[in-house]
Swiss-Prot record:
PROSITE patterns: COMPLEX1_ND1_2
GO biological process: aerobic respiration
Upper taxonomic lineage: Bacteria, Pseudomonadati, Pseudomonadota, Gammaproteobacteria, Lysobacterales
Record's bilayer topology term: Multi-pass membrane protein
GO cellular component, one term: plasma membrane
Localization per Swiss-Prot or TrEMBL: Cell inner membrane
Function of the molecule: NDH-1 shuttles electrons from NADH, via FMN and iron-sulfur (Fe-S) centers, to quinones in the respiratory chain. The immediate electron acceptor for the enzyme in this species is believed to be ubiquinone. Couples the redox reaction to proton translocation (for every two electrons transferred, four hydrogen ions are translocated across the cytoplasmic membrane), and thus conserves the redox energy in a proton gradient. This subunit may bind ubiquinone.
Source species of the chain: Xanthomonas oryzae pv. oryzae (strain KACC10331 / KXO85)
Enzyme Commission numbers on file: 7.1.1.-
NCBIfam families: PRK06076.1-2 (NF004741), PRK06076.1-3 (NF004742)
Name of the protein this chain belongs to: NADH-quinone oxidoreductase subunit H
Catalysed reactions listed for this entry: a quinone + NADH + 5 H(+)(in) = a quinol + NAD(+) + 4 H(+)(out)
One example GO MF annotation: oxidoreductase activity, acting on NAD(P)H, quinone or similar compound as acceptor
Keywords: Cell inner membrane, Cell membrane, Membrane, NAD, Quinone, Translocase, Transmembrane, Transmembrane helix, Ubiquinone
A matching Pfam family: NADHdh
Length: 363
């Protein structure tokens, strides 16, 4: 399947290059659209899946109309886009509009270094991991700006909570990725996946030797995206809707889109860093060439990556339906007193495992 896709892309790339400088610009725009459009569509269907799955957990049907519920999210988007963006008279007009854009931009920019397969990546950067850390940290600036520009006590309190929460869990996430970097010997995301390849299938993945770091990264990812049970940033029962309380229409939709795009992104990154990305869990167990449509089951491919992502994306929904919201002090205590010390200890353990050959790079 990958070869068929590449056979279509390569001639198209050469045709654009033949157009000169304008063709290079058009090709860059096309690559951006090839990332942005699928992400937007994925968010739409993810919202439908969330409402449907929570409905089943609550023993009800969930969305049933608008194309049997499939196109419910698209109907919601059209509703929001046609609503007026109301600005409080005391707000900072320019910053009020810039804030949702500043939140959305990093959420989309981070996708440029995410590999979907060995060859399906927009930019195979050698500093991809560092780039991701930078991009995922920038989104909080839009939230802080929204809280300040709204000139609302609830919005400002939500923004301050977000800043403290992101700073707290960004440290734990960064330390967890230091362990991944030590185990793989690279900060290139594709090389991190290749480091988990081998003849033992899922036993070669970093999930087993780096399991504590996997748990820390997963939970910290939930906290970074401000999702339940860490959604004190927009806690409805406490501060109405936090930094989004004054936003409506398309501006609110941009915050919503950024949040769900980040949730899908974190699901991808967990799969890449700890579960072998596109690698098959039975890779190396079967050596057969039957058909390109079947061989991916044991050779690996993007369908495996999407299945792993689907699991973690669904886990976000499961957390929301199952766990109550933590108190703010409990969230801070978990980040500073549990996760950060645990990651520091396991970085040392990981270094020892690499030194003594317990963790070996893939073939």
């Amino acid at each position: 399947m990958n070869e068929l896709l590449l056979n279509l892309v390569d001639p198209l790339h050469q045709w654009f290059l033949g157009l000169g400088d304008g063709g290079v610009v058009l090709w860059s725009v096309l690559k951006i659209l090839l990332i942005a459009v699928p992400v937007i569509v994925s968010v739409a269907f993810y919202v439908v899946w969330e409402r449907k799955l929570i409905g089943w957990m609550h023993v009800r049907h969930g969305p049933m109309y608008v194309g049997m519920g499939i196109f419910q999210a698209f109907a919601d988007v059209f509703k929001l886009l046609f609503k007026e963006i109301l600005q409080p008279s005391s707000s900072h007009k320019a910053m009020f509009i810039i804030a949702p854009l500043l939140t959305l931009a990093p959420a989309f920019a981070a996708w440029s270094v995410v590999p979907f397969d060995a060859k399906l990546v927009l930019s195979n950067a050698n500093v991809g991991l560092l780039y991701l850390l930078a991009m995922t940290s920038l989104g909080v600036y839009g939230i802080i700006l929204a809280g300040w520009a709204s000139n609302s006590k609830y919005a400002f309190l939500g923004a301050m909570r977000s800043a403290a929460q992101v700073v707290s869990y960004e440290i734990a996430m960064g330390f967890a990725l230091v362990g991944v970097m030590i185990a793989s010997g690279s900060v290139n995301l594709s090389q991190i996946v290749f480091a988990q390849a081998g003849n033992s299938g899922f036993f070669d993945w970093f999930l087993i030797p780096l399991f504590p770091l996997f748990i820390v990264y997963w939970v910290s990812g939930v906290a970074e995206t401000n999702r339940a049970p860490f959604d004190v940033v927009e806690g409805e029962s406490e501060i109405v809707a936090g930094h989004m309380v004054e936003y409506s229409g398309g501006a609110f939709a941009l915050f919503f889109l950024a949040e769900y795009a980040n949730m899908i992104l974190v699901s991808f990154l967990i799969s890449i860093f700890f579960l072998g990305g596109w690698l098959s869990p039975i890779q190396g167990w079967v050596n057969a060439d039957i058909s390109p449509w079947i061989d991916w089951l044991w050779k690996g491919g993007w369908p495996w990556l999407l299945m792993k992502v689907f699991f973690f994306a669904s886990a976000y929904i499961w957390f929301r339906a199952s766990f109550p919201r933590y108190r703010y002090d409990q969230i801070m205590r978990l980040g500073w007193k549990v996760f950060i010390p645990l990651t520091i200890v396991w970085i040392a353990v990981t270094a020892l495992m690499v030194f003594y050959g317990v963790i070996q790079k893939g073939v």
